[in-house]
Curated annotation (Swiss-Prot):
The active site is at 191 (proton acceptor). The lineage of its organism: Bacteria, Pseudomonadati, Bacteroidota, Bacteroidia, Bacteroidales. This is 3-methyl-2-oxobutanoate hydroxymethyltransferase. It comes from the Bacteria. It is found in: Cytoplasm. NCBIfam families: panB, PRK00311.1. It comes from Parabacteroides distasonis (strain ATCC 8503 / DSM 20701 / CIP 104284 / JCM 5825 / NCTC 11152).
Length: 273
């Protein structure tokens, strides 16, 4: 497998993502939640790093994204920002911090921006959270939208199945996508929707559309780091491509360490002072 060379070390900005869409350059996006992994991902040349509320699942062991708090998201965001020089860093607003009212939404977004120094925030939903989005945007905070399968609404959906297969839901998604662009979102994530629908949305919008389980006709792709590196071994949806099996490698390394300690092979003479 060839390794992409990073020729441009300039800081990635929201405007630069739009330029990438205009010239047909695909956008790479991956999650990170801590300093060490964020540093490696940034040095590898990732365009966008998402401090996702998926930390609730892969870092804290929760079944859904719902339990993670704003304080916890800020902790992860601060850790990532200390490591990143090039990538655009997006921090998710967690469940319950923007759905209630626009004043609460703005306060949440301001806390994230002030305390993490992130570049922008991401939130889920369309017309139903319009007021919150507009109020945050009026404060000069860039927003990435998120439509399709929105994990914070899992109790409403009841399942993580593909969304917008039916005509009515697809129509609403298209309307919401145009609305998010119209009111000022700089980019949009589409999760787990039919590839044809996602490609249509990407072609109709001027802002970048980044997909996860949304086919190849969008402007970029995002995956959860633990999934694509094979750390989260129990998760294997159709859209996921594994680029490593670190779960197996870590297990082997730990077992080798245990054996060396038990057998007194570690430390040897060269590993002592």
């Amino acid at each position: 497998m060839s390794v992409a060379k990073v020729d441009d070390n300039r800081k990635v900005t929201t405007h630069r993502l739009i330029e990438m869409k205009q010239r047909g350059e695909k956008i790479s996006m991956l999650t990170a939640y801590d300093y060490s992994m964020a540093k490696l991902i940034d040095q590898a040349g990732m365009d966008v790093i998402l401090v996702g509320d998926s930390a609730s699942n892969v870092m804290a062991g929760n079944v859904t994204t719902l339990p993670i708090t704003l304080d916890q998201m800020i902790y992860h965001g601060k850790s990532v920002m200390k490591a990143v020089n090039r990538a655009l860093v997006v921090v998710d607003l967690p469940f319950g911090t923007y759905q209630g009212n626009s004043k609460e939404a703005l306060a949440s977004a301001i806390r994230v921006m002030k305390e993490t120094h992130a570049d922008c925030i991401k939130l889920e939903g369309g017309a139903e959270v319009r007021e919150s989005i507009e109020r945050i945007l009026c404060a000069g905070i860039p927003i990435m939208g998120h439509l399709g399968l929105t994990p914070q609404s899992i109790n409403k959906f009841g399942t993580y199945t593909v969304r917008a297969r039916e005509e009515a839901e697809a129509k609403k998604l298209i309307e919401d996508a145009h609305l998010l662009e119209e009111i000022g979102c700089f980019a949009l994530v589409l999760e787990k929707i039919p590839a044809e629908l996602a490609a249509r949305v990407a072609s109709e919008l001027t802002i970048p559309v980044i997909g996860i389980g949304a086919g190849g006709g969008v402007d970029g792709q995002v995956l959860v780091m633990h999934d694509m590196l094979g750390i989260n071994q129990g998760f294997s949806p159709r859209f996921l491509r594994r680029y490593a099996n670190l779960g197996e490698e870590i297990t082997r390394a730990v077992q080798a360490y245990i054996e060396d300690v038990k057998s007194q092979d570690f430390p040897n003479e060269k590993e002592q002072y």
